[in-house]
Amino acid sequence: MGKVHGSLARAGKVKSQTPKVEKQEKPKKPQGRAYMRLLYTRRFVNVTLTNGKRKMNPSPASQ
């Protein structure tokens, strides 16, 4: 058994401090074949090439 890092009295401190955000109503994702088709179009059809590399997030937050 490993040693406990810090006292167990502080367990769950951060989770209890974070404000509760309600789940949003979203349109349902396609399933099975249709979802694989969506991934294919996202990855290979609408490719965003930057410096000759494929980027998953074309507009990153870093400058």
Swiss-Prot record:
<dbReference type="GO" id="GO:0022627">
    <property type="term" value="C:cytosolic small ribosomal subunit"/>
</dbReference>
<comment type="function">
    <text>Component of the ribosome, a large ribonucleoprotein complex responsible for the synthesis of proteins in the cell. The small ribosomal subunit (SSU) binds messenger RNAs (mRNAs) and translates the encoded message by selecting cognate aminoacyl-transfer RNA (tRNA) molecules. The large subunit (LSU) contains the ribosomal catalytic site termed the peptidyl transferase center (PTC), which catalyzes the formation of peptide bonds, thereby polymerizing the amino acids delivered by tRNAs into a polypeptide chain.</text>
</comment>
<comment type="similarity">
    <text>Belongs to the eukaryotic ribosomal protein eS30 family.</text>
</comment>
<keyword id="KW-0963">Cytoplasm</keyword>
<keyword id="KW-0687">Ribonucleoprotein</keyword>
<protein>
    <recommendedName>
        <fullName>Small ribosomal subunit protein eS30</fullName>
    </recommendedName>
</protein>
<dbReference type="InterPro" id="IPR006846">
    <property type="entry name" value="Ribosomal_eS30"/>
</dbReference>
<dbReference type="GO" id="GO:0003735">
    <property type="term" value="F:structural constituent of ribosome"/>
</dbReference>
<dbReference type="Pfam" id="PF04758">
    <property type="entry name" value="Ribosomal_S30"/>
</dbReference>
<dbReference type="GO" id="GO:0006412">
    <property type="term" value="P:translation"/>
</dbReference>
<keyword id="KW-0689">Ribosomal protein</keyword>
<feature type="region of interest" description="Disordered">
    <location>
        <begin position="1"/>
        <end position="33"/>
    </location>
</feature>
<comment type="subunit">
    <text>Component of the small ribosomal subunit. Mature ribosomes consist of a small (40S) and a large (60S) subunit. The 40S subunit contains about 32 different proteins and 1 molecule of RNA (18S). The 60S subunit contains 45 different proteins and 3 molecules of RNA (25S, 5.8S and 5S).</text>
</comment>
